[in-house]
Structures are given as C-alpha cells and as structure tokens.
Design a protein with these regions (language model features):
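Active-site-adjacent structural elements that line small-molecule/cofactor binding pockets in enzymes
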Residues: 1-339
C-alpha cells in the first residue's frame, strides 16, 4: 500500500514548493481534483519541479472536455514529468454536467468507456504514426495531420483510472482501464463484496489479473491529539458522510450494509437545507465503518490493517482543520507503506 497526498493548495504560485515538499516527505502521488480549480494546471507546474512523485487527477470531469483536448493536455504533462502522470477521469453526476458545465449527460458509463478508448486511439496515432480512425457512438476522430500531431514521447503509456461507484463503472474499469478511483464514501465491506467482484469480472474479460490493476481512494480519518479534538473532528466527518449518503448515486454503499432507509431521509433533509440534522443521522456504526480513527502515531497502521489487499493507494480525507508536522507526515508514510 502507498500513501498519497491530495493537493489542498491550488495557488499556482505555491504549487512547485508544495509538490517538492510532498516528494521529500515520501508521498507516492500528488492528486488534484476538479472542484474549485482546474485539475491539470497544478500538475503542469509540479512536473518540472519534481522528479519522483507521481502526479494524478482524482478526478478530472470527462465530458465537458473533448477527448482530443484531454489527450493533448495529458500528453504534455506526461512528457514534462518523464512518465509520472496518472490520468483519473470521472463522469460526475447529471446536475453538474448539465447545470455547472452545460453539457449533455447521456449514458455516462458507456460514454466514459468510449472516452478511454478514444484517448488510447489518439495517443497511438501520435506515438506510432498510424492513421487516426476512431468511430464510436458518442465520439468520432479521423483528422490528424502532421501540423497538429505532437509526435512521440519517451513514456507513451499513460495509465488511466476512472471513478466508479456502481457495478457498470467498476466492471468497465477492470475491462479497459489501469485503475479505479473508489469514492471516499466507502467501506471495507463494500470494497470486498461489491467493488472487487465487479472489477474482477472486467479484468477477466480483458484477459488481465489483479496485479495489472490499481485501487486508489481517499479514506475518511478521524485524527486528534486528545478525545475532545477527536470528537470535534468526528462531527465534521459525520457531516461530510451525511452529504454523500444523501446522494442517490452512492446508494450501493448503503445497500451493502443494509442502511438503505437512511438515504431517502438524508436526501429529504438536504432539499430542506437541514444540514445539521443530517449529520446527527449518521450513527456510530456508520462512522466506524466508513472512517478510521486514531492518532498520527497509529492511523497509518490502522489504515493498512483495514484495507490490506483491498486498496493499493490511499490518501487521507480530513474535512476539518489539520495540524501535522513534517516528522509526523514522514512517519505516516512509513506506517502505510509498511516501512
């Protein structure tokens, strides 16, 4: 298992320093997300400033960009980083596609699968000089003259991860992708009984095995130096869990544990804007299954014990103010990595 770091400072003026520090502390990958900022720009800044740490998107929203645009961006970052990019893509939900990005939302699973295949076809054209002939249900690409072709690079095999919650996405990830970004709203039971079987089905269809595939996620952790601090941070985690559990997309996680009844109740309260009451509906059992609690001296070992064999790359999800020293971070990396 490898401990990664989710970027929390998106000011491009400080990205290089942040990335170098993450690399020096031993983190395996620096992940960006597409929430308030572009996910690719920080990686372009971090690439020439570092030499070992991997650089990834967790995730970039796939459909607002043409696969051609994504292909160019990923190709350039892969070249600048000497092969350290992990391209993470996700479909997002209907509301964000249609109302935040103003793009059509249709058949998200098959369409995301086609994005992956289109990217590979475009990159093969650039790397090998083969004609670009991609024809799918949603995308078609057949024009690539030398003037627009960036040409081959030293590390052309860019790993693609997709975000998945439901069975189709997990199976599709196993069939055509290199890894799966598991949503932070997860449990070990959900991973073991729902996610892994679906991915394995896809891997078998592609003729590959588990060793060819990577599971990555951010894990909710409740960390504090004393009981009072941990209790306050636990409440912040409850609130975030309630937010995710109110979204119907994540129903498979609830169903795995027999918690289906709480989903509609949370959704109703979210429509009413009753956020405080939502957190109170998250039971201690749910909190214990979804989050890992402890101190920085033992949380890494607890993560490793719970998710050994289920996850390959993890980062900490802490929706509260974090105070951690460089020494604690370096030790945490060793705990998770088994050092």
């Amino acid at each position: 298992m490898i401990l990664d770091l989710a970027m929390h400072d998106y000011d491009l003026r400080g990205v290089a320093q942040f990335a170098r520090r993450a690399e020096s502390l031993g983190y395996g990958c620096l992940w960006t997300s597409e929430t308030q900022h572009d996910p690719f720009l920080p990686l372009a800044v971090a690439a020439p400033a570092t030499s070992k740490i991997k650089l990834g998107t967790a995730i970039a929203v796939a459909f607002p960009r043409s696969p051609m645009i994504t292909a160019y961006t990923a190709w350039d970052i892969q070249k600048a980083s000497a092969g350290r990019l992990i391209l993470g893509l996700g479909s997002q939900v209907r509301a964000h596609n249609e109302r935040r990005f103003s793009v059509k939302f249709e058949s998200p699973g098959p369409k995301l699968r086609e994005v992956v295949l289109a990217l590979r076809a475009i990159w093969e054209c650039w790397q090998k000089g083969t004609p670009l002939r991609f024809k799918g249900q949603f995308y078609s690409f057949d024009l690539m003259t030398p003037f627009f072709n960036p040409g081959p690079i030293d590390h052309p095999n860019i790993p693609i991860f997709v975000a998945g919650v439901n069975q189709y996405m997990c199976r599709m990830a196993g069939e055509v992708c290199d890894g799966l970004h598991v949503h932070p709203f997860n449990t070990a039971k959900y991973l073991r009984e729902f996610v892994h079987p679906a991915v394995e089905e896809g891997l078998r269809a592609s003729g590959r095995t588990r060793q060819h595939f990577t599971y990555a996620t951010s894990v909710f952790v409740v960390v504090g130096e004393n009981e009072r601090e941990r209790a306050a941070n636990a409440e912040a985690v409850r609130q975030q869990i309630a937010f995710y559990a109110s979204t119907r997309t994540y129903a498979p996680v609830l169903a795995t544990h027999g918690w289906e009844a709480i989903g509609p109740e949370l959704h109703k309260k979210s429509l009413q804007g009753d956020w405080q009451a939502m957190g109170q509906l998250i039971t201690d059992e749910m909190l214990d299954e979804i989050a890992v609690a402890g101190t920085y001296e033992n949380i890494g070992r607890k993560l490793r014990e719970r998710y050994a064999g289920l996850l390959d790359r993890v980062s900490l999800y802490q929706p509260y103010e974090v105070a951690i020293t460089d020494a604690q971070q370096a030790d945490l990396v060793k705990q998770v990595n088994g050092g």
